[in-house]
From Swiss-Prot:
Species annotation: Thermoplasma volcanium (strain ATCC 51530 / DSM 4299 / JCM 9571 / NBRC 15438 / GSS1)
Protein name: Small ribosomal subunit protein uS3
Residue intervals of the KH type-2 domain: 16-85
GO MF entry, a single one: rRNA binding
Subunit structure and binding partners: Part of the 30S ribosomal subunit.
Length: 225
C-alpha cells in the first residue's frame, strides 16, 4: 500500500512538473522545487523572465494555482516565482534558447557553438550540448558540442551534472536539444588538496579536473550518425 502511494505521489509530481514547464517555457524555465508544509504545498519556479509567469496583477500565477488545486489535487498550492541566478549556467534555459534559435532558422552548428561559447564565458567547468534529429539531410543523427570536464556515469554523472532538455519544431521534423553542465557547486571526487601539517596551511592542490580545464580551453566538437 505504501509502495502504491509512493508511486502515485511520484507520478503526480511528474505531471505537475510537466504542466508548469509547459506554462512557463516562454519565460525561460530554469527549475522547480516543490515542498509540502503544514500550511500547504510550496512551489518555487525559477525562470529567466519572472514577469511573464506572474502576469498582470498576478493573474497568471492565480490561474496556475487554481489548475494545480482542481486538476492535480495539490493541497493549498502556493507558487513563488524567482529569477534564475545564472541563466547562462542553467541547462534548461540554455536548451530552450537553442531550440528557439533553431526555430528561427539558425544552423545547428551556429546555435550550438554560440551557446557553448556563452556558457564557457559564464564560467562553466564542463558542458555538453547535443542536438539530435534531421539536422542535415534526410537521415536522423546528432551533433555534440563538448567543453571541459563532462561526466557520464557514476555519482558525478548522476549528481554532478545538471541536465536540461527542449525541442525545436521545424519543417523537417522535431529536433531534440539536450544540455548538460557540471554543477559549479559540485565537488568532484578526484579533487584533493595538500596541506602543511605543521601550520595547517594549504600549500597546493591537484585535480584531474583542473588539468582537463587547462588543456581543453577550446571546445571539441564531435559528430556522429
Amino acid at each position: 500500500m505504501k509502495e502504491r502511494k509512493f508511486v502515485n505521489e511520484a507520478v503526480k509530481r511528474l505531471l505537475v512538473y510537466e504542466y508548469l514547464v509547459k506554462e512557463t517555457e516562454n519565460a525561460g524555465f530554469g527549475k522547480m522545487s516543490m515542498k509540502r508544509t503544514p500550511f500547504g504545498t510550496n512551489i518555487t519556479l525559477y525562470v529567466n523572465r519572472p514577469g511573464l509567469v506572474i502576469g498582470r496583477r498576478g493573474s497568471k500565477v492565480q490561474q496556475m494555482t487554481e489548475t494545480l488545486e482542481k486538476k492535480y489535487a495539490i493541497e493549498t498550492p502556493q507558487i513563488e516565482v524567482k529569477d534564475v541566478k545564472d541563466p547562462d549556467l542553467n541547462p534548461s534555459v540554455i536548451a530552450k534558447k537553442i531550440a528557439l534559435s533553431l526555430e528561427k532558422g539558425w544552423s545547428y552548428r551556429k546555435a550550438g557553438n554560440t551557446s557553448l561559447k556563452r556558457t564557457i564565458d559564464a564560467g562553466a567547468r564542463g558542458v555538453l550540448i547535443k542536438i539530435s534529429g534531421k539536422i542535415s539531410g534526410e537521415r536522423a543523427r546528432y551533433q555534440k558540442f563538448i567543453y571541459g570536464n563532462v561526466k557520464y556515469s557514476g555519482e558525478p554523472g548522476s549528481k554532478g551534472m545538471l541536465v536540461g532538455f527542449s525541442t525545436a519544431k521545424l519543417k523537417v521534423g522535431i529536433l531534440g536539444v539536450t544540455v548538460k553542465i557540471l554543477n559549479p557547486e559540485y565537488k568532484l571526487p578526484d579533487v584533493f588538496s595538500i596541506s602543511n601539517l605543521a601550520g595547517g596551511e594549504n600549500v597546493g592542490t591537484e585535480s584531474e579536473t583542473d588539468k582537463a580545464d587547462e588543456q581543453g580551453r577550446e571546445a571539441a566538437n564531435t559528430e556522429e550518425s
